[in-house]
Regions:
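Conserved, mostly hydrophobic/aromatic
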Residues: 28, 48, 71, 78, ...
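Short beta-strand segments
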Residues: 46, 114, 133-139, 177-179, ...
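Charged (often Lys/Glu-rich) extended helix/loop segments that serve as interaction or gating elements
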Residues: 250-416
Length: 416
């Protein structure tokens, strides 16, 4: 990828016809280092959030060695770009072919499940292997999240103890996991879920080797200002100390959004202005799926090739709706988005914080979807991991020192 200091430098230096994804590798590396330095256990990157090759390469270079995968294509990607990495197949429902290939072709030994039928598939397709790590996914409350993931996966509490006992009989190592929901705004949600998991483990009357607190770690978006990330880690650490598990039990987490949300933005061109409607060359079927369908708020800013300093237009702003390039009327993003009132055809809008699920959900519907990737070095929006832009303007970003000693539990000798 070609590197520009800022997206505005790109806009001023060349014609921009198709959407341009602005990658920020430093933001991925910074987030990866933060989790490795602060989370008191194993950190798995949830590949679903952004499976781009450049993201995997940066994470691997930054020290990430454990990946949460959901399909054979994701497994193949990780195997290609991160050759020494461990993988956990944490999709609770997998095809028999996927289980078999993951185990025999790629050496995957960690599998999630939330029912006995899935457990039987795993056992049958691995020929009742004795080296399996089985992770039982529990259903927990998603009340603390802005985007609930409850309802599709997770064994309900009234069945959980039996499921944990059954899995224990077939597992070399046994774990429990849960997901508190996407963009969790309450650190206490992890504590509640962990203590519920502890209760179910005690009810099952067996030992577990792994507690996986899943994902849900938040990012900063317009109107969404979560607590500092270290408050989430503190809540998890404190709850882990209270859990009724062995001293040598491992603690895992699966950040996706938190690792990559700051990593990408898209430059999209205004093709038509019609009242308060802006027609763009990217939209709901491209990298703005969440903006359209989940009504997710993303930051925007205008770039003009010929304008005043910093590419700014008039100080007066107006509220706009956005429409994507396809012929589908559902390709609409109601917003409202505050942009300069004199915005015009040919102007470039940068839509930020698209690193999580922007690329992953993009399609080529109607023949649209082709994009160019470039790297940029700026950090225009608030970050969970580094100093705010107004604190670091025109200087190198300064890392906020939040690292604490990693209080890992003593590692005792594993069961034979």
């Amino acid at each position: 990828m070609h590197t520009y200091h800022t997206p505005l430098d790109l806009v001023r230096s060349r014609h921009v016809e198709s959407p341009v994804v602005c990658a920020r590798p430093d933001r991925v590396a910074q987030a990866s280092h933060w989790f490795q330095d602060n989370f008191p256990g194993e950190v798995l990157y949830a590949v679903k959030a952004n499976p781009s090759a450049w993201v995997l390469d940066v994470l691997y270079k930054a020290g990430t060695r454990f990946f949460d995968v959901a399909s054979i294509p994701e497994i193949q990607l990780v195997a290609e770009h991160c050759p020494a990495a461990r993988m956990a197949f944490l999709h609770p429902v997998k095809s028999r072919e996927s289980i078999r290939r993951a185990y025999y072709e790629f050496g995957v030994r960690i599998f999630a499940l939330d029912c006995e039928a899935e457990l039987n598939k795993i056992l049958e397709e691995t020929n009742h292997a004795r080296d399996l790590t089985l992770i039982v996914r529990l259903a927990v409350s998603n009340d603390g999240a802005l985007f609930s993931l409850a309802g599709k996966f997770g064994v309900p509490a009234y069945e959980a103890a039996d499921m944990i006992r059954t899995a224990r009989a077939h597992a070399d190592e046994l774990g429990v996991s849960f997901h508190v929901g996407s963009q969790c705004m309450q650190p206490s949600a992890y504590r509640s879920a962990m203590l519920e998991a502890s209760r179910l483990i005690a009810q099952a009357g067996v030992t577990v080797d792994i507690v996986d607190v899943g994902g849900g770690f938040p990012s900063i978006y317009p109107g969404m200002n979560p607590p500092p990330m270290d408050e989430y880690i503190s809540a998890i650490e404190d709850a882990f100390e209270e859990m009724m598990v062995l001293e040598n039990a491992d603690l895992w987490c699966e950040p996706g959004r938190a690792l990559v949300s700051e990593a990408e933005s898209v430059l999209t061109r205004v093709e038509l202005v019609k009242g308060d409607a802006l027609y763009l060359n990217d939209g709901a079927y491209g990298r703005l799926f969440d903006a359209a369908h989940a009504k997710w708020p993303f930051p925007v800013r205008l770039h003009r090739r010929h304008s005043t300093a910093n590419g700014k237009a008039s100080a007066e702003t107006a509220s706009f709706r956005l429409f994507g390039p396809t012929c589908d009327s559902l390709d609409a993003i109601p917003g409202p988005f505050e942009l300069p009132a004199d915005i015009a055809e040919g102007d470039i809008i940068e839509i930020g914080m698209l690193g999580a699920y922007g690329t992953a959900l993009a399609t080529n519907f109607n023949g649209f979807g082709s994009v160019e990737y470039v790297a940029v070095e700026d950090m225009p929006w608030p970050s969970m991991f580094v100093a705010q832009p107004d604190q670091a303007e025109d200087t190198d970003a300064t890392v906020i020192s939040l690292a604490r000693a990693r209080r890992r539990r003593p590692k005792l000798r594993r069961r034979a």
